[in-house]
Swiss-Prot record:
Record-given protein name: Arylphorin subunit C223
Pfam family, one: Hemocyanin_M
UniProt record similarity statement: Belongs to the hemocyanin family.
Protein function: Arylphorin is a larval storage protein (LSP) which may serve as a storage protein used primarily as a source of aromatic amino acids for protein synthesis during metamorphosis. It is a constituent of the sclerotizing system of the cuticle, and serves as a carrier for ecdysteroid hormone.
Organism of origin: Calliphora vicina (Blue blowfly)
Source species taxonomy: Eukaryota, Metazoa, Ecdysozoa, Arthropoda, Hexapoda
Sorted UniProt keywords: Secreted, Signal, Storage protein
Tissue expression as described in the entry: Fat body.
PANTHER family linked: FAT-BODY PROTEIN 1-RELATED (PTHR11511:SF5), LARVAL STORAGE PROTEIN/PHENOLOXIDASE (PTHR11511)
Length: 759
């Protein structure tokens, strides 16, 4: 990790924050040139660099201390290691470079000589955290490293894709299908008006392509990329222009299946392996990387420890609701002694061909891994229990922390993340890393490590054991607040404000199809014309994913005067897996915050709407790698105004996942709405443009200064809790089967993709 810090350091730092206006900013030529460089430098990052301009730049690398705003011993050691060939093959240094020229040169050098995983890690951190890089973006992590998000079968097919071979294959495939699918319905039994075809009789959920008669190989995409907001792009003349002459190919992609052992948990693989869901966790840990100190990077202004731990709670709440949709119930408790009933096979492959390790059913945690780590992690939880119970902690430098104050959750959060702002950096800083290494049966003393999902942020949430272990982490959060006095009636009451009613529109989830850009997996020859790269082919992974129809709230709030207020919205379960009502005291741990927004009430009755698309922390589908690169090139030619908000901010949670799967007949859930006074001196998003920036280190990311999860952060006294400015609303979440029609009616174009699947 020290290498990553150094690589981050050598790539650059500038310390001035900028204030943006609310108008859409258009990139200038200088910005576009920088953006072009970033897109090209990570193109096929596992292959040798093929752009001559950047190769020459990388070869011009020099190591001069004057080029950096801050220079430390790790940077010096890195260069010494490089001279003697002792660095990881390819990977590490970027944040403290004085200017773009130094940064660019160092990045080109690192791309050629450093480990590709370390390179992308450090480059991502630099782009996210440098103040002078606001607006610059990298492709999404699942576009840079698709193999961390899609199964090995798909990855192998993408890596061996060859257009000439594909063209011949498709010719024979067509002749084959013309015979195979001719009058196919007459050969199979029509029973109760349902069509059960040979190619769909072994259909499993989410294997949509079998219902259309497709195979798991490449198909030409002659229309458009599939996604939520595709209509916006398909009607854009500039969009159609940039894709003229570009060949697109898609392949159906499955989620993890039971291959070697039965495992009911794989029924949730569509959720735990969701690309956007896993990317969210990755970027959270990039935004608040454990080794970045809060003072230098301004992260302490964002309550980084509390925010990280609250996100753990949010993700667990969301996962629990998805489990309830399938009748699974509580997340199993993690134990270092008892065996883990359900195993997991990620079916992923590293870029060098080595497969990711898997865990069998009834896995015994204590029987594997390095026992030094085992005892360190056990000791850590014992110490946390001790200091929280005691209520006072004295740091190694003599500072006393009162753990009965609610704001002390910031310290607890930093300890649980193991970041460098911890109270006792020597003991607490490494426990989190040791825990992941132990669960991945890794060893710091070995030079070669087998890939394991617990060793990468972008893969760890795929495993059901992740939620079991992080439930143990979240238990420390709740243990801390168990010692904080519950809110009193007076503290919760907002005099003069009453929520009279909230109407919720119909809540409907469904599965749709989406294309992910996986062009980085291609191995064919790159095309250059006059030294300029021509992006003429794009590979797409077409996958089914959970989504929901847009919904809205109709608020009716009465106020005795005009005033600014904060309105919070939470979603939580109503019943457990056995149909029993969950008491509010227990259920507070299961509510997930969906939205909080500022609103100015007038005196009297206020009626207004809030739409799901406006939730403050969610994002729509991001613009793809191919599209971004082509837009940049068009803008450099002066034919397009490149807006800085062309893609969604990296830190947003996928909008389509805010609702759990639900049931066909309606799954009972409940919304909780809460209105509080707006008393914060600052205005949210006031120092940055939230349409493209995450505002890290700004101190104004959040709507106010109350504890995250308020008022569900503390234990609930039901005699004190209920006030007129709160409102509970019982709802049902319905699930519609988008693909049911394929069983109900004959599909006339069997063997061809159905673009009307969602109608």
């Amino acid at each position: 990790m020290k290498i990553a810090i150094v690589l981050l350091a050598i790539v650059g730092l500038a310390a001035s924050a900028s204030i943006t206006d609310k108008k859409v900013k258009i990139a200038d030529k200088d910005f576009l040139a920088k953006q072009k460089f970033l897109f090209e430098i990570v193109y096929r990052v596992e292959d040798p660099l093929m752009f001559e301009e950047w190769i020459k730049m990388g070869k011009s690398f020099t190591f001069d201390k004057a080029d950096y705003n801050h220079f430390d011993m790790y940077m010096d050691k890195f260069y010494e290691a490089y001279k003697y060939g002792a660095i990881l093959p390819k990977g590490e240094f970027f944040y403290y470079a004085k200017n773009w020229e130094v940064f660019q040169r160092n990045v080109a050098f690192a791309r050629m000589h450093c480990n590709e995983g370390m390179f992308v890690y450090a480059l991502t951190l630099a782009v996210i955290h440098r103040d002078d890089f606001h607006g610059l973006i990298l492709p999404s992590i699942y576009e840079i490293f698709p193999q961390y998000f899609f199964n090995s079968k798909f990855v192998y097919e993408a890596e061996k894709f060859d257009y000439d071979v594909w063209s011949k294959y498709i010719m024979y495939e067509k002749e084959y299908k013309d015979i195979l699918y001719k009058d196919y319905a007459t050969f199979y039994k029509n029973h109760d008006n349902h069509y059960y075809y040979f190619f769909t009789k072994d259909f499993k959920t989410y294997q949509w392509w079998k219902m259309m008669g497709l195979g798991e190989h490449w198909y030409s995409e002659d229309r458009f990329m599939l996604r939520d907001n595709m209509d916006k792009y398909n009607k854009d003349s500039k969009y159609l222009e940039i894709f003229e002459g570009t060949k697109m190919f898609f392949m159906p992609v499955d989620y993890t299946r039971d291959i070697e052992f039965f495992n009911k948990e794989s029924a949730l693989s569509y959720f735990t392996e969701d690309v956007g869901f896993n990317a969210y966790w990755y970027y959270l840990n990039m935004d608040y990387a454990f080794f970045l100190d809060g003072k230098t990077y301004g992260l302490n202004k964002d309550r980084r420890g509390e925010y990280w731990l609250y996100n753990v709670r949010q993700l667990l709440s969301r996962y629990y609701m998805e489990r309830l949709s399938h009748g699974f119930g509580e997340i199993p408790a993690f134990s270092f002694i008892d065996s883990i009933e359900y195993g997991y096979n990620p079916q992923l492959v590293y870029h060098n061909g080595v497969g990711f390790s898997y865990r069998k059913n009834y896995y015994e945690v204590e029987s594997f891994g390095k026992f030094d780590y085992f005892y360190k992690v056990l000791d850590f939880f014992n110490r946390m229990d001790e200091i929280i119970t005691k209520g006072v902690y004295v740091t190694y430098d003599g500072k006393t922390i009162d753990l009965r104050k609610p704001e002390s959750i910031e310290y607890i959060g930093s300890i649980m993340q193991g970041n460098v702002d911890t109270l006792h950096s020597y003991f607490f800083k490494y426990w989190y890393m040791f825990a992941h290494m132990y669960l991945a049966y890794d060893n710091t003393q070995t030079l070669q490590v087998f890939p394991h999902i617990f060793l990468n942020y972008e893969t760890s949430m795929r495993d059901p054991m992740f939620y079991m272990f992080y439930k143990k982490i979240a238990s420390v959060y709740f243990q801390f607040f168990n010692y904080v006095k519950p809110y009193t009636h007076e503290e919760l009451l907002f005099p003069g404000v009453t929520i009279k009613d909230v109407k919720v529109s119909e809540l409907v989830t469904y599965f749709d199809l989406v294309d992910f850009d996986v062009t980085n997996l291609m191995n064919d020859k790159m095309t250059f014309v006059d030294g300029q790269f021509v992006w003429d082919k794009t590979l797409l992974a077409r996958q089914m994913r959970l989504n929901h129809k847009p919904f809205d709230f109709d608020f009716v709030i009465e106020s005795d005067k005009a005033q600014k207020v904060v309105i919070r919205t939470y979603l939580g379960p109503k019943y457990d897996e056995f149909g029993r009502v969950i008491s509010l005291t227990e259920n507070r741990e299961n509510f997930m915050e969906l939205d909080s927004f500022l609103y100015t009430l007038k005196s009297g009755v206020n009626e207004f709407k809030r739409y799901s698309k406006d939730f403050y922390w969610t994002v729509e589908d991001r613009t793809t790698y191919t599209e971004l690169y082509k837009y940049v090139m068009l803008a450099l030619q002066g034919k397009y105004d490149f807006p800085l908000d062309i893609s969604e901010p990296h830190c947003g949670f996928p909008d389509r996942l805010v609702l759990p799967h639900g049931w066909y007949k309606g799954m009972p859930m409940q919304f909780f709405f809460y209105v509080t006074p707006f008393t914060t001196e600052y205005e949210q998003f006031s120092t940055y443009d939230y349409s493209y920036s995450c505002g890290l280190g700004s101190g104004v990311r959040y709507i106010d200064e109350t504890c995250f999860g308020y008022p569900f952060d503390r234990e609930i006294d039901e005699y004190e809790f209920f006030v007129p400015n709160m409102y509970f609303k019982d709802v049902k979440i319905f699930h519609q089967d988008t693909f049911e029609k394929y069983f109900e009616h004959k599909y006339e174009k069997f063997g061809h993709f159905d673009y009307n699947y969602h109608h």
